[in-house]
């Protein structure tokens, strides 16, 4: 239940808080941050992927419902991003297997199918995508999902 609360219901609560002001202005942009795990579930976190799948679906519904009122809703779906969570996973692998950090990161990359760009993404790169999606330059973009994963997801 914690995965659902953190990865879906927190966004729903925030949206409920900000939507009245956006509706009053008849404009606004919401960007939800999902995860590539909704497309490729990870057995090590079985509730996380489904919660992110629900968030992605919820974003589509919100875009359709509030688009006529001038509110845009999009989803950003990161793959392997260098975060404290990714680092913690690498450290757990190091401890479990008694291997170096480089070996643990290589194991993580193999588990997710590799990253063609050869490195994890950065939080700054994800933030730049979000900034674009809330900007006027993206005024006609709504109901879309943007995968930012260095080419990892090869599914159409």
What does each model-found stretch correspond to?
Residues 40, 130-131, 142-156:
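Short C-terminal tail/terminal secondary-structure segment
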Residues 1-5, 92:
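Active-site Tyr-X3-Lys motif and surrounding loop/helix of classical short-chain dehydrogenase/reductase
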Residues 35:
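Residue(s) in the substrate-gating loop at a strand-loop-helix junction
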Residues 15, 51, 59:
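Active-site helix of classical SDR
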Residues 40-46, 68, 118, 136:
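Active-site loop immediately N-terminal to the catalytic Tyr-X3-Lys motif
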Residues 20, 64-65, 139:
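Alpha-helical segment proximal to the catalytic Tyr-Lys
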Residues 67, 72, 141-143:
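Short, small/polar-rich loop/turn modules that mediate ligand/substrate recognition or access, typified
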